[in-house]
C-alpha cells in the first residue's frame, strides 16, 4: 500500500522527520510529492528518498503551487494500485497504524482518519446549523461519514469507476453554485445543502448515496498537528500571523485555553490551528537549529493536552534517533 504525501514550499526540511516515523512503524511505501517546492527542496526530497526503497519522489507537472484538490485529482489519475491513499505531511506515527485499517478495507470503499490533535469530537461533527462543510468535519450529527483529506484510503477500482461514470473529481463542486442540479437534489435529500464544501466532501457524500460504504476511524498511533503546511508557506497562508510570543502569553491562561477548545466559528478555528501550528513549528525549528525548546503548551482538556504532549515527545525522540538522516 502506497501513500501520497504532498509537500509544499517551506516544509520539506522539517517534515521529512514525520515521514521517518511512518517508515519506522509501518510496512507501507510512500510517494513524496513536490507541489511547487523550490529546486533546493526538490533536491532535498530526492536525496531523502534514496535512504529507503519504500520512498519515491514525484514532482507534480504543474507550474508553481497548485491547490490540494488539484494535486489529489492528478495523483488519483496516475494511481495503478488497488488503493488510492494519501495523508498530510504533518502526521507523525507512534506505532503500526496500518494494522488497524486493513480489516476495514474488506468492508468499506473508503477509510479515513487523521483528525488534528487539538480538535475534540464536537469540533469534528457537522451540525445542521453549519453553512460551510470544512475539512475538520468528518461526520454529521446524524452519523454520516464525510471522509477526510487528512488521511484517506480509497478502493481505487471502485473510486476510478465512479469518477469515470459521474465525471465528479476531487477538485470539482466546492461551492453550491457549481454543483449540477441532479447532485444538488441528492445533497438536499441528505439535508446537506451548504454554501461551500471542502475537498472531496461532495464526492464522498454522493458515493455513499449511490451505495458505497465509508468509515472514519480514529487511530491511537497517528498524531496530526494540522496547519504546519500553511504556516511554513508563509505569505500563501490565508490566516494572518498572530505571533508565537503573544500566543505563549495567552497559553498560560486557562480561561483562554478553554475558549480555544470551545470556539467553533471558521475564523476562530483557523486561529486555534495557527496557535498550535506556531507551537510545533517553534519546536521543530529549535531542534533543527540546536536551540532551547519552547515551554509546554498546556490545555485544560486532558485528552488534548496529553495528545499534544505525546506529539511533542515523539518529535523530539524521532529527531534524536534520526537527525543524521536529514543532512543537517
Question: Where are the model-predicted features located?
Answer:
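Short aromatic/hydrophobic "clamp" motif used to bind/position activated sugar donors
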Residues: 84
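The conserved acidic donor/metal-binding loop of glycosyltransferases
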Residues: 88-92
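Short, acidic, metal-binding catalytic loop of nucleotide-sugar glycosyltransferases
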Residues: 20-29
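N-proximal low-complexity "stem/linker" segments adjacent to membrane-targeting elements
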Residues: 1-17
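Active-site-proximal specificity loops/subdomain of glycosyltransferases
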Residues: 40-79
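Conserved catalytic core of nucleotide-sugar-dependent glycosyltransferases
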Residues: 99-183
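Catalytic core and acceptor-binding pocket of nucleotide-sugar-dependent glycosyltransferases
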Residues: 147-248
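Short beta-strand/loop segment that forms part of the nucleotide-sugar
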Residues: 28-39, 60-61
Amino acid at each position: 500500500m502506497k501513500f501520497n504525501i504532498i509537500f509544499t514550499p517551506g516544509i520539506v526540511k522539517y517534515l521529512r522527520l514525520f515521514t521517518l516515523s511512518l517508515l519506522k512503524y509501518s510496512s507501507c511505501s510512500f510517494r513524496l510529492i513536490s507541489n511547487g517546492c523550490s529546486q533546493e527542496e526538490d533536491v532535498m526530497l530526492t536525496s531523502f528518498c534514496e535512504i529507503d526503497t519504500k520512498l519515491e519522489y514525484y514532482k507534480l507537472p504543474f507550474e508553481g503551487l497548485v491547490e490540494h484538490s488539484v494535486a489529489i485529482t492528478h495523483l488519483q489519475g496516475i494511481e495503478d494500485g488497488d488503493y488510492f491513499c494519501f495523508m498530510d505531511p504533518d502526521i507523525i506515527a507512534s506505532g503500526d497504524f496500518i494494522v488497524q485499517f486493513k480489516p476495514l478495507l474488506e468492508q468499506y470503499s473508503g477509510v479515513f482518519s487523521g483528525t488534528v490533535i487539538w480538535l475534540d469530537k464536537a469540533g469534528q461533527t457537522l451540525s445542521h446549523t453549519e453553512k460551510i462543510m470544512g475539512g475538520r468535519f468528518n461526520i454529521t450529527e446524524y452519523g454520516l461519514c464525510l471522509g477526510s483529506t487528512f488521511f484517506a484510503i480509497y478502493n481505487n477500482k471502485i473510486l476510478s469507476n465512479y469518477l469515470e461514470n459521474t465525471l465528479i473529481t476531487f477538485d470539482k463542486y466546492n461551492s453550491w453554485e457549481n454543483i449540477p442540479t441532479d447532485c444538488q437534489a441528492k445533497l438536499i435529500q441528505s439535508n446537506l445543502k451548504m454554501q461551500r464544501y471542502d475537498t472531496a466532501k461532495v464526492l464522498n457524500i454522493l458515493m455513499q448515496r449511490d451505495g458505497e460504504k465509508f468509515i472514519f476511524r480514529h487511530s491511537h498511533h497517528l498524531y496530526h498537528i494540522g496547519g504546519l503546511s500553511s504556516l511554513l508557506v508563509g505569505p500563501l497562508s490565508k490566516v494572518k500571523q498572530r505571533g508565537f510570543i503573544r500566543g505563549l502569553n495567552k497559553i498560560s491562561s486557562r480561561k483562554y485555553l478553554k475558549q480555544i477548545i470551545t470556539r467553533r466559528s471558521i475564523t476562530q478555528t483557523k486561529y486555534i490551528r495557527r496557535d498550535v501550528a506556531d507551537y510545533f513549528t517553534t519546536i521543530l525549528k529549535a531542534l533543527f537549529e540546536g536551540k532551547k525548546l519552547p515551554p509546554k503548551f498546556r490545555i485544560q482538556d486532558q485528552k488534548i493536552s496529553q495528545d499534544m504532549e505525546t506529539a511533542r515527545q515523539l518529535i523530539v525522540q524521532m529527531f534524536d534517533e534520526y537527525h543524521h538522516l536529514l543532512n543537517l
